[in-house]
Amino acid sequence: MHIGIDIVEVPRIAKALNRGDKGFLNAVYTAGEAAHIEQAHAGDVRAAGIWAAKEAVVKAFGVGFSEGVTFRDVEVRYTATGQPQAVLSGKLASLAVDRSLQVLSISISHTENYAAATALVGPVSAEVRPV
């Protein structure tokens, strides 16, 4: 099992989002994430949480944003009950297959000023069971 964690200042993400163009939004977030951020009541906070989750996932894989991995290789989606899930694509998905690893769980939390996330990555054969 591997754990990744990240924390980010919400104002830092808000500043990047509010520069006047959508360059940052389009470079970092998938179309689904961007729509979710733009529809959210506190879009800056939501964007920071998704940023932290992406960082936590790549840290759990032990690669960070290297070896061709990009922010858009991790997409954060939400279940009907609001639970975040990570969907992999691109180079990170290939690395996961090569290493027989999968994202078992992610968790996102935030305040007005900070967003934090953790990611648990483990073998494809692993199963997460409720406690």
Swiss-Prot record:
Binding of Mg(2+), residues: D6, E55
Any one biological process term the GO annotation gives: fatty acid biosynthetic process
UniProt cross-references to InterPro entries, sorted A to Z:
4-PPantetheinyl_Trfase_dom, 4-PPantetheinyl_Trfase_dom_sf, ACPS, Ppantetheine-prot_Trfase_dom
Q: Where in the cell is it found?
A: Cytoplasm
**Listed GO MF terms:** holo-[acyl-carrier-protein] synthase activity; magnesium ion binding
**Which keywords fit this entry according to its UniProt record?**
Cytoplasm, Fatty acid biosynthesis, Fatty acid metabolism, Lipid biosynthesis, Lipid metabolism, Magnesium, Metal-binding, Transferase
Q: Which cofactor does it need?
A: Mg(2+)
GO CC, one annotated term = cytoplasm
Q: Where on the tree of life does the source sit, at the highest rank?
A: Bacteria
EC annotation from Swiss-Prot or TrEMBL: 2.7.8.7
Which catalysed reactions does the entry list for this protein?
apo-[ACP] + CoA = holo-[ACP] + adenosine 3',5'-bisphosphate + H(+)
Top enzyme class: transferase
SUPFAM superfamilies in UniProt: 4'-phosphopantetheinyl transferase (SSF56214)
- A Pfam family in this protein? ACPS
**Role of this protein:** Transfers the 4'-phosphopantetheine moiety from coenzyme A to a Ser of acyl-carrier-protein.
Entry's family note: Belongs to the P-Pant transferase superfamily. AcpS family.
The cross-references to NCBIfam families, in alphabetical order and at most eight, read: acpS, pantethn_trn
**Under what name is this protein listed?**
Holo-[acyl-carrier-protein] synthase
The species this protein was found in = Verminephrobacter eiseniae (strain EF01-2)
